[in-house]
Amino acid sequence: MARYIGPLEKLSRREGINLYLKGKRSYTEKSALRKRNYVPGQHGRQKQKLTQYAMQLRSKQALKRMYGLMERQFRNTFEEAERSRSGETGEVLMQLLERRLDSVVYQMGFAPNRRTARQIVTHGHILVNGKKVNIPSYRVKVGDVIEVKEKSRNIQQVREGLELVQEGYRNIPNWLNVEIENFRGTFQRLPKIDEMDVPVPLTNIIELYSK
């Protein structure tokens, strides 16, 4: 399945959840979801009663799209969480998603959304413990230091991300310690389930993949 390249805010409208895919626009009244809170298409305004399977599928699609993963990537991550003995499957799944380097770069405020964070990582603008890492799926460990390369600190995407934090549109999560003035942050600890932005019932995803 190819990566989605269409209008990003249509994805939020389709899922009925703000997936924060458009940077600053997603946090304001200009958000397409706030202006048109119904699914795209000719019959979008008509409320549809979803089956249990459809609700489970929608939950999976929403979380997958929020983190920008393809089906195989998401399924592999879920199966790893399911095998883990370090906690409940849902919590471990979210922790694995939040430990992706592109997600950490976004959460630290160095990008306005996860899609842009993925591009920033891929283009070699990010250092992990002083070394360049250009793999968005790289798994960050507790204690890792994430930094924007000195030569990359004035690129527009990084500035846009930091503006969202500085203008109060976004907050940096408690499990991260970020020195905005130094374009650097530390992944201090694993996040707890009640600290993460979980837009869907994780039990829906667990039940879907258990079939």
Swiss-Prot record:
GO cellular component, one term: small ribosomal subunit
Pfam families referenced in this protein's UniProt entry, alphabetically: Ribosomal_S4, S4
Key word Ribosomal protein present: yes
Biological process (GO), any one: ribosomal small subunit biogenesis
Keyword terms: Ribonucleoprotein, Ribosomal protein, RNA-binding, rRNA-binding
SUPFAM superfamilies, A to Z: Alpha-L RNA-binding motif (SSF55174)
Domain S4 RNA-binding stretches: 99-160
One GO MF term: structural constituent of ribosome
Family per record: Belongs to the universal ribosomal protein uS4 family.
NCBIfam families assigned to the protein according to its UniProt record, in alphabetical order: PRK05327.1, rpsD_bact
Assembly: Part of the 30S ribosomal subunit. Contacts protein S5. The interaction surface between S4 and S5 is involved in control of translational fidelity.
HAMAP family to which the protein is assigned, alphabetical: Ribosomal_uS4_B
Protein's job: One of the primary rRNA binding proteins, it binds directly to 16S rRNA where it nucleates assembly of the body of the 30S subunit.
Protein name: Small ribosomal subunit protein uS4
Native source organism of the sequence: Petrotoga mobilis (strain DSM 10674 / SJ95)
